[in-house]
């Protein structure tokens, strides 16, 4: 189960997340296997995903899985950590196409809007889905999910402050409050994107969302 954003992740030159090395070296690409697991977890969530689902998607026997990971929870944590790592790099690259803070925020909005189209949109975002299930996750899993959410919010806060400094974003509102509002808008797009929004609808949503920075 490999979708468009997972292909992009596999081609990204990112540092490998901790893969909890144990025993003899494994004869498969751990990052590539985790990328495939991300698609399953994003679409089904942690609880509805079985080890059999992961074994099939990752194209590994359950024996190979258990040599690399302790259990399903271990795979999930590795998936969230890798998703955070790679998606943060992609998001940072996208926003840097803007010149002002506002233009960078717009680029960030468009980054999420583009992810809402097609198969990626229908599948949803791993972190957004995990946030909705946060109450049902144990402390270890909840911690890595919150870490991914906090990382995105920190980038948004930085861009808001950059915009306020260069005059492209209003100073009437607190920067942290604006960043959290932007985070809610971005994550909300990913949730509603699962219903099959058109590019035109998403474009209109982004246009209206940007008004919070006026």
Describe the function of each predicted region:
Residues 85-88, 103-106, 139-165, 177:
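Amphipathic alpha-helical packing segments from all-alpha helical-bundle domains
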Residues 115-117, 158, 162, 182-199, ...:
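Amphipathic C-terminal alpha-helical segment
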Residues 1-28, 172-173:
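N-terminal intrinsically disordered/low-complexity leader segments
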Residues 26-27, 38, 42-44, 52-53, ...:
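Recognition helices and adjacent regulatory flanks at domain boundaries
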Residues 10, 32, 36, 40-74, ...:
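Helix-turn-helix
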Residues 6, 123, 128, 171-192, ...:
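Hydrophobic alpha-helical segments that form the core
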Residues 104, 119-140:
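Amphipathic alpha-helical segments used for helix-helix packing
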Residues 78, 92-123, 175-182:
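Hydrophobic alpha-helical connector segments
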């Amino acid at each position: 189960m490999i979708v468009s954003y997972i292909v992009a992740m596999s081609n990204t030159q990112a540092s490998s997340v901790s893969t909890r090395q144990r025993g003899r070296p494994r004869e498969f690409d751990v990052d590539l296997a985790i990328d495939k697991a991300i698609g399953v977890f994003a679409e089904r969530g942690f609880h509805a995903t079985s080890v059999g689902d992961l074994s099939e998607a990752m194209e590994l026997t359950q024996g190979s899985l258990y040599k690399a990971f302790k259990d399903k929870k271990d795979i999930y944590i590795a998936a969230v950590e890798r998703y955070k790592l790679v998606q943060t790099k992609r998001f940072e690259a996208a926003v840097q196409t803007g010149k002002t803070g506002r233009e960078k925020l717009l680029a960030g909005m468009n980054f999420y809007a583009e992810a809402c189209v097609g198969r990626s949109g229908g599948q949803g975002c791993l972190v957004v889905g995990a946030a909705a299930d946060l109450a049902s996750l144990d402390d270890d899993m909840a911690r890595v999910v919150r870490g991914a959410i906090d990382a995105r919010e920190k980038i948004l806060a930085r861009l808001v402050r950059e915009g306020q400094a260069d005059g492209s974003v209003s100073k009437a509102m607190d920067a942290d409050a604006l960043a959290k509002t932007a985070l809610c808008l971005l994550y909300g797009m990913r949730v509603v994107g699962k219903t099959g929004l058109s590019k035109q609808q998403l474009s209109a949503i982004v246009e209206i969302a940007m008004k919070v920075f006026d």
